[in-house]
Amino acid sequence: MFHDSAHAAARFGLSDAGNIYGRLTNSTQDVLEKRIAALEGGVAALAVASGAAAIAYTIEALAQAGDHIVAQKTIYGGTYNLLENTLTRQGIQTTFVNVHDIQEVEDAVQEQTKAIYLETLGNPCLLYTSPS
């Protein structure tokens, strides 16, 4: 809630820190993020609305044009599409591998590889993958 139009203008002008709009800043989400960070011993946390958003944010934070990702072949279709199509258009290449074959994973790693992505219970096949 804004006290007056000057207060609203200051918030939207970013000269006064605080909540502006629920999609940009949200006091409930802020409390959750701070508590998760404290529980995990971290500096900060980010809560997003879906697993797909979390995956996209993480990969885009780690990789940029010219970089590479190694990913499990049997992953959720939306994630496969992100890696195979969306990120390819941004210049991030992905090699899909059988993560149960460690040699195949190792062979896929390149100098530009920024992450190895796997799902411990890969959708749609429900194959269990141990990250160890």
PLM regions: where:
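Glycine- and other small-residue-rich loops at beta-strand/loop junctions that grip anionic moieties
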Residues: 21-22, 47-48, 72-73, 94-97, ...
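Buried hydrophobic positions in well-ordered alpha/beta secondary-structure cores of metabolic enzymes
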Residues: 36, 54, 69, 116-119
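Conserved PLP-anchoring active-site segment centered on the Schiff-base-forming lysine
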Residues: 61-79, 97-98
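Conserved small/polar residues in nucleotide/adenosyl-binding loops
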Residues: 128-132
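Short, surface-exposed connector motifs at secondary-structure boundaries
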Residues: 39-42, 63-68, 88, 114-115
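Conserved N-terminal alpha-helix of the aminotransferase class I/II PLP-enzyme fold
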Residues: 4-56, 78-85
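PLP-dependent aminotransferase-class I/II
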Residues: 81-126
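CheY-like receiver
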Residues: 35, 58, 104-108
